[in-house]
Regions:
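Conserved SAM-binding loop
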Residues: 301-302
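Positively charged, low-complexity nucleic-acid-binding target-recognition regions
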Residues: 307-315
Length: 315
């Protein structure tokens, strides 16, 4: 699996292993909206058949704690959502507000309101959630207590923690098997359990916390974004530069990548187009693998990313 490469092949013909993608950013053809690639299907039903194929391939590739972004036009995104909702868990139906659109908001020529938005569906794998991360930590602690004490008596655990002396309280919240959402122990409480369970429960709290964080789906909202994403459409400036009809803004793409992935994560780009997603992945120290059926766009995407990859760093 060669990283940081744009393949000039159909995304459906990839040879990637299952669950390899930490983040998928897919900007597919919207169907009869803009660009030659939007008009290759005879009917909308034919287009939706391909959407289903793309969806299933994304499902195969997305890791258990990964995130998928799926772009679409405001008129047709509902049809894609019906398909994706069958296979993923919908986190957000995001609206990308592009701002002023060719001054049409001041004109009545369209006989309707000016189109200034696109949609981005945000999905996770419905089979994996935060609770499962806590279950793994809880099960480790339970196993170590059993090694040390032979069995788990919640009252004794509470006494060791210096909390309630009955069978409920903190011990029940953190360790009981019948809790649908167990609570994470604080560092102070965990260290008390370590002293009580010597020579077992040897993992340090910071090690457990790091494991917990790495198991969670990445989401750090450093840009304070909400469901409406206000990013100007840079296409007027970048479209001609990259010779593509649907160039996505670098600012928006960077925000999605930084919010929903970690450094060295793998970003899969099923439709690399002008190369924005690949280039911004490289810029933010993520690995990427892109796919593009048009040769000139595949070459352009690779060159755009390579320019960033070859930039000297301070360290």
């Amino acid at each position: 699996m060669k990283l940081n490469k744009v393949h000039n092949i159909d995304f459906l013909n990839n040879d990637l292993p299952d669950k390899c993608a930490n983040l998928i950013i897919a900007d597919p053809p919207y169907y009869k909206t803009k660009g030659d690639f939007d008009f290759i299907w005879k009917t909308f039903e034919d287009y939706l058949l391909d959407v289903e194929k793309w969806c299933l391939e994304c499902k195969r590739l997305l890791s258990d704690n990964g995130t998928l972004f799926w772009y679409g036009g405001s008129k047709n995104i509902a049809y894609a959502q019906i398909i994706f909702d069958k296979h993923f868990y919908l986190l957000n139906n995001l609206t990308w507000n592009k701002g002023s659109f060719m001054g049409l908001e001041e004109s009545e020529i369209l006989r309707s309101f000016a189109p200034c938005t696109e949609r981005i569906l945000m999905y996770s794998n419905e089979t994996y959630n935060l609770t499962q991360c806590i279950f793994m930590i809880r099960d480790y602690i339970r196993a170590e207590i059993i090694k040390a004490k032979g069995k788990i008596v919640l009252k004794q655990v509470n006494e060791a923690l210096g909390t309630a002396t009955n069978g409920g309280g903190v011990a029940s919240a953190c360790l009981s098997l019948d809790k649908t959402e167990p609570t994470m122990l604080t560092k102070e409480m965990y260290q008390k359990l370590q002293s009580w369970c010597k020579p077992y429960l040897t993992k340090e709290y910071e090690e457990l916390r790091k494991e917990y964080e790495e198991l969670r789906r990445p989401f750090k909202n450093k840009f304070n974004l909400q469901e409406v994403l206000n990013f100007s459409n840079e296409q007027a400036k970048t479209g001609a530069k990259y010779d593509h009809d649907t160039v996505k803004p670098e600012t928006l793409t960077r925000a999605l990548i930084l919010t929903c992935s970690r450094e060295n994560d793998l970003v899969i780009v099923p439709f690399s187009g002008s190369g924005t997603e690949c280039a911004m992945s490289a810029k933010e120290k993520r690995n990427f693998i892109g796919y593009e059926i048009t040769e000139k766009h595949a070459k352009m995407s690779q060159e755009r990313a390579n320019k960033i990859l070859k930039e000297p760093t301070l360290f």
